[in-house]
Amino acid sequence: MLKGSITALVTPFDREGAFDEKAFRAFVNWQIEEGTKGLVPVGTTGETPTLSHDEHKRVIEVCIEVAAGRVPVIAGAGSNNTVEAIELAQHAEKAGADAVLVVTPYYNKPNQRGLYEHFSRVARSISIPLVIYNIPGRSIIDMTPETMGALVRDCKNIVGVKDATGKIERVSEQRAICGKEFIQLSGEDATALGFNAHGGVGCISVTSNIAPRLCAEFQEACQAGNFAKALELQDRLMPLHKALFLEPNPSGPKYALSRLGRIENVLRSPMVTIEAATAEKIDHAMKHAVLIN
C-alpha cells in the first residue's frame, strides 16, 4: 500500500497568511494526476508547528476528501507529548486517513525506552497503520534498529519507517531486524537511489512537491530494478534536491511552487522567504530538470 513517490505536502497560505484551502485542493489533485502514489499532509514540510490544532485537522480532512481513495493519505500525527500525539492520531483515523506518520519526540530527548513507550502507546490507541519518522537531524534523537524491531514485534500496526538518518546501511540493518515486509521509505530525496537499492520501497519526498511526475518515474524505475533509468532521472533531479534545501524547508519548495503558479510564496514566522541568490539557484535547478524554460 505504501510505496513509490509519496509527497510530503506543503500547506499553502494566502497573502494574509491563512490556510489557502482552494489552492490546496487544486494542489492535491495535481499531485495525484501527475503520478504521486501517496500524500503526507501536516508534516515538517507542511509547517505543522505553526498550524493551530484546528488548522492541522482541517488540512488532513481536505486532503482525504480530495484524494477520495485514489492514493493513500498518511497523516502527520507527531508530537513530543504522547497524549497529544494520541489525540492527533485518533483524529486522523476518524477523518479517514489510511495511516499516520509519527515523528520521534523532539526537544525533550527521550531515551530508547521512552521512544518505545511513546510509539507503543500511540500505536495501541488506533487501528490504522503507523509509520515511524526517524529524523535525528531535527529531533536530536535516533531510534535504534533494535528499538524499532521491538516495536514492530509488539505492535502489529507499526508497519514501516520514514528514515531520514542519511545512513544507507540502516535499510539493511532494519530489514534484518524488522523483517522483509517492513516498509522502509527514504526521508531524503538525494539518497533515495541508494536507499532503494538496499531494500527501500519508496520515498516521502519534498522534491515531488515541485516535480511529482519525475519523482514518480524515478521511484517506478527503482522498483522495477531499472537503476540505469533511475540514475538518469536522479541526474536530472539532483540539482533540485540540493537547491531546495539551501535554506530551511519549506522555504525553497514554496518559492519553486510559486514559480509554477501553484501557490503563493507565503510562510509563517519564524520561517521566512528565501534570499534572491537562493532563488536564482532554484531557478537554475528547475531549468535543469526542464520544469521551467
UniProtKB/Swiss-Prot annotation:
What is the recorded name of this protein? Answer: 4-hydroxy-tetrahydrodipicolinate synthase
Where mainly located? cytoplasm
Q: What Enzyme Commission number does this protein have?
A: 4.3.3.7
Which reactions does this protein catalyse? L-aspartate 4-semialdehyde + pyruvate = (2S,4S)-4-hydroxy-2,3,4,5-tetrahydrodipicolinate + H2O + H(+)
The gene behind this protein is: dapA
The record's section on SMART domains has: DHDPS
Where does this protein reside within or beyond the cell? Cytoplasm
**A Pfam match:** DHDPS
Assembly and partners? Answer: Homotetramer; dimer of dimers.
Q: Which InterPro entries match?
A: Aldolase_TIM (IPR013785), DapA (IPR005263), DapA-like (IPR002220), Schiff_base-form_aldolases_AS (IPR020625)
Q: Please, which domain of life does this record's source organism belong to?
A: Bacteria
Q: In which pathway does it act?
A: Amino-acid biosynthesis; L-lysine biosynthesis via DAP pathway; (S)-tetrahydrodipicolinate from L-aspartate: step 3/4
Listed A to Z, the keywords are: Amino-acid biosynthesis, Cytoplasm, Diaminopimelate biosynthesis, Lyase, Lysine biosynthesis, Schiff base
Residue positions binding pyruvate:
T45, I204
Q: Which Gene3D superfamilies match?
A: Aldolase class I
Known NCBIfam families for this protein? dapA
Site annotation Part of a proton relay during catalysis: residues: T44, Y107
In the record, the note on similarity to other proteins reads: Belongs to the DapA family.
Q: Does the keyword Amino-acid biosynthesis apply?
A: yes
Q: Which residues form the active site?
A: Y133 (proton donor/acceptor), K162 (schiff-base intermediate with substrate)
Q: What molecular function terms (GO) are annotated for this protein?
A: 4-hydroxy-tetrahydrodipicolinate synthase activity
Q: What does this protein do?
A: Catalyzes the condensation of (S)-aspartate-beta-semialdehyde [(S)-ASA] and pyruvate to 4-hydroxy-tetrahydrodipicolinate (HTPA).
What Gene Ontology cellular component terms go with this record?
cytosol
Does the keyword field hold Amino-acid biosynthesis? yes
Report any one BP term from Gene Ontology: lysine biosynthetic process via diaminopimelate
